[in-house]
Every structure is written in C-alpha cells, then in structure tokens.
C-alpha cells in the first residue's frame, strides 16, 4: 500500500470510529476491506468524489426494538431485537437472524457489512442486511422459543418483505425458529411469500439449503487446492464448531476423500485421530440438532476420541483448517501453530473467524487462505436460489441446486483470482473478494 492509500485508510477509519464508537467488530471488518480497496479507490477520482466506500459503511437503516415475551413460569422477559439494513443497491436486503447473548449492534453491523460484499460476489440480486437478538435459545423449552420468535416477528414483520428484506437463519436460528417466525409472519400479513429463507422443504424451502454453507466452503477450498494441483483426497482436516456449517463441511470433506479429525463447541473440542466418518457424523447431528447436547458426549461414546475442555482445535496437526464456529476464534498464536504443523489451506466457514494477526501470518507464509465472505457464500447463494424458486412457485431437485451452488462457488473463486493475484503469483483471496464484491455494489450505487 502506498503512502496516499495508507493516508486514505487512516482518515477514513478515524471518521468511522468517531461516528461509531465502541464497535470493535465493525471497525475490524471495515478496516480489512478499506485496506484492500484503498489503492483501487485513490486511483479512481470518481470513487473518491462520490464517497462510495463511506456510503457503503453507513447502514441505510438500523431498527432496534423491544421483544417482551412470557416464559414457562409465567414471568415476563425482555430482550432486544435488531435489524441492520445495510445496502440495497443490487437487491433487497438479505442476511441472517442471530439469537445469541453476545449479539449487539457492533456485531450485527459487521455482519451486515460483510454480507453486502458476500451477496455481491454470488452474482445474485441481493443487498446486505443482518438481524438478531440477545435472546439465548440454549436451555429453553420449545414453547419458550416459540413465544420469543412470535414476539420478535410481531415487530420485525413491518420492516421486511420478499422485495424489501429477506431474513434467514444464523447462529441460534435453525429450522425450528424459522418455522415459528414464518408462521407468525403469515398470520399477521395474511400472505404466503418467500419473505424468509431456510424454510422446511414442505413449505417453500429449497433442497440443500441446510447443507449449502458447509458444502460451498468445501467447493471453494477444492478450487483453491486445485491452483496448487492438490485436492481433499488423503488430507487431514480440522474443523471447529459442530453446528450446521461444521456438520456439512465435515460431511462434504469426507465425501471428497479427506479425514476430518476435530469438531468443537463453546465448551471445548474433540480430537478423533481415526476420523469422523458418516456414522459418527450422524451421531453428532442427532446430539446437536435434536438433543442439543455438548460435543463432550462424542468422546464418551467413541473411545478413539479425546475431549479437550475449554480449548480450540488449532494445535492439532492437519493439512486443511476450516473454522466454522464464530468470529475471532482463531488468533495469531493459533495461526502460527497451524503453519508450524504443515497446514496448507484455511477456508473460513464462519464469518470473520480469523483475527487480523492470524490472516497476516497465513499470508506471510503463503498459505491458501479464503475469507468467509468468499468461502461461506454458498449459504446465502442457496438462499437466493430459494427466493427464485418461491417467486416462480417451483421446486428444483437437490441435484439441480447442488450444480448451481457448485457453479456459483467456482465463479466466486474465479473473481477472487482475477482481482487477487499478486505480482509474485500468490493469490490474495482477501483482496480479491473485497475488490470483486465492491465493484458490483459501487457501480450500482454510482448509477443510482
């Protein structure tokens, strides 16, 4: 980065921090993008004059609302709901809803900002948004989750719609929660439309939607590996998380010939040197999706596995790492451990799971590193395909959706290579994804 570009980033970030104090996740996400785009922006008088990045970094609308609901003891509880409608230059706002105690405005603004670029990369007509609440569904009965979802949607419904804003699931929001919210939306609005994605197959959902983020991350990693004449076959893979993304990344990596040896949750991780095969993965899916248990129970059931409480799996020797849990879960020291252990490829299944220090280390050592906005775009791409099917009142077969998903991930990889290839031949996927995602949104904003 030259002096002019560096000065642009510092001035831009100083203004952003002044306007958005105490929002570290948002600052981190914007800085990463600004550093990638700065040389491009300072070379373009139009982008500077029209202040395109400054406009993208300011949400079009932020909605914050009260969510009162009745728990099983008959007591009133109050949570806070949010919807950040970031950018609608290329389509209706699109992005997930997250239910987790850590949810705050900074996290949702960072996610909505990232979502804008990710949705642009898919080439589908979707803007960027994100929402959620500090409600914690863990340990709650189905009845309590239903009451909360209904109260949440009672307010949210006035701000969304199939041509305005189309939410989906995220951490803490799966098929059960989407069902409760869709039912409430339908009761209040008296219409059956594709206003939410991630719906059940029998009522407007798309085949492969649950699998899409994990599968797409593997398809992207496969394309990256191919640039070095490598593949998943015979490789050892470390995956963090044990939710939707981690489960299907594990399944697809195994199908592609790799051996997945770790999964984790907020309490710790399991290491199974024999590999997590289809039968073991089925147990994990039952444990997590139905019984909502802890990953520790995997080690109790399979003697080949060992459980490490309070730790993350990045010290385990592997060829490919796929962080699929949550933001900033992989720091500089852990990145160095992966490098020292011979890891060649890191593909982010979660949103911004690697800290800036970790990314720097991966890039210094010329690892194949894919940021979440490119690698995990398969989820929102398939949400876009669900919106298309809802609009046309048809359902495609799983094979058709998989082929379209695969094609989208290959295209995203091509865009990253086009914009991210450095003079020495190294592909900087962070720069490639940021410039590729930015250009489409910027051109649309300039035209409007």
Over which residues does each language-model region extend?
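Rossmann-like adenosine-cofactor binding region
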Residues: 268-369, 374
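Buried hydrophobic packing segments
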Residues: 108-111, 181, 217-225, 249, ...
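Adenosine-phosphate binding glycine-rich loop
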Residues: 2-29, 224, 337-448
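Short, glycine-/Ser/Thr-/acidic-enriched flexible segments
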Residues: 70-72, 83-89, 104, 140, ...
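Glycine-rich phosphate/diphosphate-binding loop of Rossmann-like nucleotide-binding domains
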Residues: 197-200, 205-317
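Conserved active-site and cofactor/substrate-binding residues in soluble primary-metabolism enzymes
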Residues: 7, 21-28, 32, 47, ...
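General beta-strand structural signal in soluble alpha/beta enzymes
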Residues: 164-168, 191-196, 239, 262-265, ...
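N-terminal ligand-binding/catalytic initiation module
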Residues: 1-208, 440-448
């Amino acid at each position: 980065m030259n002096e002019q570009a560096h000065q642009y980033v510092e001035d831009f970030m100083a203004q952003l921090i002044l306007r958005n104090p105490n929002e570290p996740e948002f600052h981190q996400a914007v800085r990463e993008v600004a550093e990638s785009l700065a040389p491009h922006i300072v070379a373009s008088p139009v982008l500077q004059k029209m202040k395109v990045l400054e406009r993208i970094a300011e949400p079009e609308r932020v909605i914050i609302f009260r969510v009162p609901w009745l728990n099983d003891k008959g007591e009133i509880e109050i949570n806070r709901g949010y919807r950040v409608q970031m950018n609608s230059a290329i389509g209706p706002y699109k992005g997930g809803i997250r239910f987790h105690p850590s949810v705050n405005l900074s996290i949702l603004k960072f996610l909505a900002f990232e979502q804008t670029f990710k949705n642009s990369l898919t080439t589908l007509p979707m803007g960027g948004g994100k929402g959620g609440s500090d409600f914690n569904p863990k340990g709650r009965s189905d009845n309590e989750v239903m009451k909360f979802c209904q109260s949440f949607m009672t307010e949210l419904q006035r701000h969304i719609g199939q041509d305005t804003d189309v939410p989906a699931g995220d951490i803490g929001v799966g098929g059960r929660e989407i069902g409760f919210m869709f039912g409430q939306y339908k009761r209040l609005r008296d219409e059956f439309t594709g206003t939410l994605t991630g719906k059940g197959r029998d009522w407007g959902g798309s085949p492969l939607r649950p699998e899409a983020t994990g599968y797409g991350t593997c398809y992207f990693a496969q394309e990256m590996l191919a640039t070095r004449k490598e593949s998943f076959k015979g490789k050892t893979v470390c995956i963090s998380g044990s939710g939707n993304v981690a489960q299907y990344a594990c399944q697809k990596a195994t199908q592609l010939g790799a051996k997945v040896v770790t999964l984790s949750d907020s309490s710790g991780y399991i290491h199974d040197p024999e590999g997590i095969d289809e039968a073991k993965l089925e147990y994990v899916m039952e444990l997590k999706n139905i019984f909502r248990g802890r990953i520790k129970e995997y080690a109790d059931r399979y003697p080949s596995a060992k459980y490490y409480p309070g730790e993350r799996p990045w010290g385990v020797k592997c060829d490919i790492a796929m962080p699929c849990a949550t933001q900033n879960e992989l720091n500089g020291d852990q990145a160095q451990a992966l490098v020292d252990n011979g890891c060649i490829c890191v593909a982010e299944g979660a949103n911004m799971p690697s800290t800036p220090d970790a990314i720097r280390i991966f890039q210094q050592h010329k690892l194949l590193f894919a940021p979440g906005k490119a690698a995990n775009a398969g989820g929102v791409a398939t949400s876009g395909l669900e919106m298309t099917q809802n609009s046309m009142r048809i359902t495609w077969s799983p094979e058709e959706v998989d082929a379209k998903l695969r094609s989208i991930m290959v295209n995203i990889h091509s865009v990253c290579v086009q914009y991210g290839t450095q003079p020495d031949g190294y592909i900087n996927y962070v720069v490639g994804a940021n410039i590729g995602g930015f250009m489409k949104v910027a051109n649309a904003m300039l035209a409007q």
